[in-house]
Each structure stands twice: as C-alpha cells, then as structure tokens.
C-alpha cells in the first residue's frame, strides 16, 4: 500500500509539473521577427518584453517563458 501511495504521489507531482510547464510558454508577437537569429538575441527580446527567456520558435512564432 505504501508503494502505491508513493507512486501515486510521484505521478501527481509529474502531472503538476507538466501542466505548469505547458502554461508557462507565452507567444510574444514582437519577438517573432528574431526567430531566425541566435539564441542570445531571442533571449534578449523575451527579456525586453518582461519574460525570463525564449522557450522555442515554431513556424516563426516566438514562445517566451
């Protein structure tokens, strides 16, 4: 029973982390134009708009976290 509780708890923690990570990414339209540039410039654009850094660029759409 203790193993079941521990497994359930770990699964719950992992699910919470996935949900939090998914919600953290925000599209920043002004940064779309820097998607083709180096990572440092992408991070700078996201920081200039109040985010910690860039998460990804997908089809020319910048996602910041």
Curated annotation (Swiss-Prot):
It comes from Machimus arthriticus. Expressed by the venom gland. One of its GO terms (molecular function) is toxin activity. May act as a neurotoxin. Belongs to the asilidin-1 family. The keyword Secreted applies. This is U-Asilidin(1)-Mar3a. The lineage of its organism: Eukaryota, Metazoa, Ecdysozoa, Arthropoda, Hexapoda. Disulfide bonds join 31-46, 35-57, 45-64.
